[in-house]
Swiss-Prot record:
Region (Disordered): 592-630
Class in the EC hierarchy, top level: translocase
Molecular-function annotations in GO: ADP binding; ATP binding; proton-transporting ATP synthase activity, rotational mechanism
Listed EC numbers: 7.1.2.2
Biological source species: Sorangium cellulosum (strain So ce56) (Polyangium cellulosum (strain So ce56))
Catalysis performed (reactions): ATP + H2O + 4 H(+)(in) = ADP + phosphate + 5 H(+)(out)
Function statement: Produces ATP from ADP in the presence of a proton gradient across the membrane. The alpha chain is a regulatory subunit.
Entry annotated with the keyword Ion transport: yes
Name of the protein: ATP synthase subunit alpha
Length: 630
């Protein structure tokens, strides 16, 4: 077969035409050194800080890395995975992408690693959206003050150190003092409240993470929880990035108008991992060998927790809004954001339907004519109802992300570098003390130095009305208890304060994995602060509390319903609570024995005052027997 030159040239031309002209240009480099999760790469002169790079191993596998250092002749990158497959001379390719993780409803009930990949053996994540791990925190205008309570189910916290939705509350204490237990109880208590929980385990044992997963599953809490695990066996880069993955997953739910709770257990391990990376990257060390930007490491993470502002629009009646579109505007060309958004939207609506009448209202406001203001507002309100316009709220606004970071201290030293940093960033701290823990006070919360700076605004009025008395009584008890160690004889008032304090301390004790509904907390704390438990022995209070809840649920269920719905303790409700507690106390005393019954009937204060009675009887008996002998 002979081919002519013309045919050959035509074949070549066709082949050239079929070649895709869009050439793909990729910048590649080579590994200079690798070890301890860090690689030095030469040849990526145009790489950007925070960019993902792809390492291609000599054995064919590939790993992702994150550019952290940009130097004159090389780039320092943290490798996400086992570095044993990466060797000197291996190729490294730029991706041009910032690190992203999958987010969405499919993550609920799953255990993922620091890269957002599932590790629970339940198959791949079927998510439609990916989000950047590093984003700016919401600005001032996008936020609103904390006003809704985030009930933890723990009496001592909800009463004296309340947490609100959108708050950042630090849990701090030595190792093995119950920090994780407090966090897990808070997750369990969110069941049925519409709160999505994200638990980030940093540097923990795999067995510990497994226990947490099993406990959440046993209490039906795993269905609304996502576990992000960067365990002790993971490399430092994965432990460093895990909290950012967790908050990114939580932000998805916050930005869809829902409420999320993020727990970082614990940030001390993240700081240690970041210190390791920084030292390997030859960054200058500072205090305790941490790098200079370790404060920013935690501040940019915790600032992403926020209560988002509600957004209102003036629209034509019947208009449906999907929400979440920052560029959307109402018929007045505005989006009314923030604490005064509803007020602003109302004014805009009134101005749209009757500008002349609204001008009169504005003038009346300037002149402070209250009666005229009220009259004009009513007229405009009636016109607004009859108009073709209405005010609607963006359904994806008003969400919240609450952060509960955990910090481990050494021998109770809260003045160390990382604890002081995180204390200054957060809106309060719950301090767990080893001495209290080992003395049987669990949760071992030191109420004296624990504080919530903004949660009080979110606390329900019923709890607020009794919590002030509780904190004061406990403070007096601690002062008196310290004083009584040196005093041999105490007056009746001091003894009564010590007795009251001992009972209040006892009722604040709580078992693990048994969070309490707020109405039950209010009932028992009310009983303690009003002195209704003073006649009961301290040792019986735990059983008394448990049986009191059952009694009220069975005989007086309306009390719990009223507390839950009204959220205020009026005189009638207080009277019914007191009556129910007194009724049950008599029954409890009869079951406990005759001595307690007598104490209830006589209204005796404490056991010490009842003790001399038997001695008096024995003395009279002796004198009577002597008289008979004579």
């Amino acid at each position: 077969m002979q081919l002519r030159a013309e045919e050959i040239s035509q074949i070549i031309k066709k082949q050239i035409q079929n070649i895709d002209k869009a050439a793909q240009v990729t910048e590649t480099g080579t590994v200079l050194t690798v070890g301890d999760g860090i690689a030095r790469v030469h040849g990526l002169s145009r790489a950007m800080a925070g960019e993902l790079v792809e390492f291609t191993g000599s054995e064919g596998g590939s790993l992702m890395g994150l550019v952290l250092n940009l130097e004159q002749d090389n780039v320092g990158a943290a490798i996400f995975g086992d570095t044993s497959s990466i060797k000197e001379g291996d190729a490294v390719k730029r991706t041009g992408r910032i690190m992203e993780v999958p987010v969405g409803e499919a993550t609920l009930g799953r255990v993922v690693n620091a890269l957002g990949m599932p590790i629970d053996g339940k198959g791949p994540l079927e998510t439609k959206e990916r989000r950047r791990v590093e984003v700016k925190a919401p600005g001032i205008i996008q936020r609103q003050p904390v006003t809704e309570p985030m009930q933890t189910g723990i009496k001592a916290i909800d009463a004296m150190i309340p947490v609100g939705r959108g708050q950042r509350e630090l849990i701090i204490g030595d190792r093995q003092t119950g920090k994780t237990a407090v966090a897990v109880d808070a997750i369990i208590n969110q069941k049925g409240k519409g709160v999505i929980c994200v638990y980030v385990a940093i540097g923990q044992k795999l067995s510990t993470v497994r226990q947490v997963v099993d406990k959440l599953d046993a209490h039906g809490a795993l269905e609304y929880t996502i576990i992000v695990a960067a365990t002790a066996s993971e490399t430092a880069p994965l432990q460093f990035i895990a909290p950012y993955t967790g908050v990114t997953i939580g932000e998805y739910f916050r930005d869809s108008g829902r409420h999320a709770l993020c727990i970082y257990d614990d940030l001390s391990k993240q700081a240690v991992a970041y210190r390791q990376l920084s030292l390997l990257l030859r960054r200058p060390p500072g205090r305790e060998a941490y790098p200079g930007d370790v404060f920013y490491l935690h501040s940019r993470l915790l600032e992403r927790a926020a209560k988002m502002a509600d957004v209102f629009y003036v629209v034509s009646k019947g208009t449906k809004i999907e929400g979440g579109d920052a560029s959307y505007r109402g018929i007045d060309g505005k989006a009314h954001v923030g604490a005064h958004g509803m007020h602003s939207a109302k004014d805009s609506l009134w101005k749209t339907i009757d500008g002349a009448l609204f001008e009169k209202l504005e003038q009346a406001r300037k002149d402070e004519k209250k009666d005229e203001i009220k009259k004009l507002e009513q007229q405009l309100s009636d016109k607004a109802k009859a108009s073709d316009y209405e005010i609607v709220r963006d359904p994806k606004s008003g969400g919240s992300l609450t952060a509960l970071p955990v910090i481990e201290t050494q021998a109770g030293d809260v003045s160390a570098y990382i604890p002081t940093n995180v204390i200054s960033i957060t809106d309060g701290q719950i301090f767990l003390e080893a001495d209290l823990f080992y003395s049987g006070v669990r949760p071992a919360i030191n109420v004296g130095i624990s504080v919530s700076r903004v949660g009080g605004n979110a606390q329900i009025k019923a709890m607020k009305s009794i919590a002030g008395t509780l904190r004061l009584d406990l403070a007096q008890y601690r002062a008196m208890a310290a004083f009584s160690q040196f005093a041999s004889d105490l007056d009746a008032k001091t003894r009564a304060q010590l007795e009251r304090g001992a009972r209040l301390t006892e009722i604040l004790k709580q078992g693990q994995y048994v969070p309490l509904a707020v109405e039950k907390q209010i009932l028992i704390i009310y009983a303690g602060t009003q002195g209704l438990l003073d006649s009961l022995p301290v040792s019986s209070l735990s059983r008394f509390e448990e049986e009191l809840y059952k009694f009220v649920e069975a005989k007086h269920p309306q009390i719990f319903t009223d507390i839950r719905e009204k959220k205020v303790l009026d005189d009638d409700l207080k009277s019914r609570m007191t009556k129910a507690i007194d009724t049950f106390k008599k029954r409890f005393a009869v079951e406990a024995g005759g001595a307690s019954t007598a104490a209830d009937e006589d209204g005796a204060g404490d056991d010490e005052e009842e003790a001399p009675a038997p001695k008096a009887k024995s003395k009279n008996a002796k004198s009577a027997s002597k008289a008979k002998e004579k």
